[in-house]
Amino acid sequence: NYAAYYTNLKRQFLAFHEKWSLDKKPDPALSLSFGRWTNYAGEILSDKRHLSLVANITRTQIKRLEKNGIKSIDALADAKVASIPKMNKNIFRRLREQALLQVQSEAQDIPKYKLIADHDKIGLSLLPPHSNSDLFFDIEGFPLFDDGLEYLWGITYFDQSGKRGFKDYWAHDRDEEKLAFTSFIDWVFERWTNDKEMHIYHYGAYEINALRRLMGRFGVKEYEVDTLLRNEVFVDLYKIIRQGLLVGEPSYSIKNIEHLYREKRDTEIASGGES
């Protein structure tokens, strides 16, 4: 059953060795992942000022820029042309502005930024009015568990006295995952019922997808989740930032975006795997 797969791998392996040269370093930018060499590959790309340092750029865009003589983040930031062949003019302008903001923000505690959309139904205009009941929540998932396990739920909010609060739910198995899901939905639904101006902020689509997945997995809280979704209680801040701002950071992860509004942390933030 695996003969064709093995033959293909063997062919690729032998072809790699035929072309291998001690004097020719592989280009990290041509790899999809670096495994245990991630830090070293990052150093090479950083030293080369490679175009992959530009936030949200794609491999196809990099190839087209390089074909037109733009081979570094600095060259893109300094580009004098208004467009290049086979690339949308607006996309090129956005990439150039992104590169320029990143170059200008280097060695700065607070990155440069630019508003790029201020009309209805896009960008910052999607932010709803403030409510004292607003909250922010995040989920961490463990993909190596069968069908995944949403093992950590964290929520920040303000209580009735105005003091900052934090709730967390942990799950080490499927039963605890169900309990975390139902407890979270019960709590936020009651909070929203008492204040229909409340919104639940999150960063990226993962949280909403996880709630839908758990609702289907356990067959509970369909009414509550559907009601919250239909009333647009959930607000994706990642979508708002991507549509509304250009930020001089190499990534638009929340760990990078927070450089806009808070001082540099004294400690490292744990990744999902580390947590």
Where are these regions (language model features)?
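Conserved DEDDh/DEDDy metal-dependent 3′-5′ exonuclease domain
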Residues: 1-19, 157-159, 166-275
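Short secondary-structure junctions and interdomain/linker hinges
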Residues: 13-24, 61, 72, 83, ...
